């Protein structure tokens, strides 16, 4: 399915679905979860670099990424899923700014 591509292309229904199934569960999981995922994606999916940036143990990063998968159904280490999660974060933040 091309959900993130459709959402990024401006499909309002796709944006709503992506935000609801990926971004909102991340918000509900807490700031640490969202910060960990964002840092992980920014660091090229490196557990070690993410742990260093967040001043936590790599096992903490692993645990939080498992929680991301449990909450969203997307696996951050998978390239396609990571892209989908990144799109959801961007679109969710934009939607929050618009109110």
Describe each region flagged by the PLM.
Residues 1-99:
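Cytosolic nucleotide-utilizing catalytic cores of signal-transduction proteins
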